[in-house]
Amino acid sequence: CLVGSEMCIRDSMDTVDEHFSLEWLKNIEDVLNGKLPSYLIVSHMEPDHSASIHACLKKYPQITIVGNTKTFQMIDQFFPDLIIENKLVVKENEQLNLGNHQLKFVFAPMVHWPEVMVTYDTKDKVLFSADGFGKFGALDIEEDWIDEARRYYIGIVGKYGLPVQNLLKKAMLLDIKLICPLHGPVLSDNLNYYLSLYDKWSKYESEEDGIVICFNSVYGHTKSAVLELVKVLHNHEYYNVKIFDLARCD
């Protein structure tokens, strides 16, 4: 929630799968403390983020749904019986005045669906990045951000390098102090690290020089050949060689 002279709910931070709609709405009610929200911004129509739109409208029928043209096309397709009394169709770089907060909408098609847009809070310098900069895992598990973030990136937008590059170019024009993704922790420190990784991944560049050999060996002969190949590579001073048995690795 962004709390200003007008209340705004952002789906990228709060909306959940429909199985958790009641819990989500209770959390919103507690935060608003009796006040009514003015806007619900829909950044991404994937069901794990959009499924609570119907429940939100039922509880707050006066709320204005904010999205782009493609957003509302998909809402009509996903929820054909849904009646939206108030809607605001925004364009690229259009801003929404919330009183002491100003939100700027930046379109990010195909990161990860065609309707995706991210939202930038010009006051607090926060980028609500939709599916961008997310990761798998839980907050109570100590692990390097990059491992599950890389796996998440490959699974969500790995084949959409050009759209990610387009979003990065737009993000470079913003003064970002905080990144709030749909999935995973809020990013607040060393943001250039995360941006540089997304730049590298979306350009399909390797993170380090090396050789990867993936194999499957039913009788062990192919494995023996792979091990011999590794020796040959080492003899030619290629030492960063990693092998993976596809039948036994995750």
Identify what each model region corresponds to.
Residues 19-66:
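Active-site metal-binding motif and surrounding structural segment of the metallo-beta-lactamase
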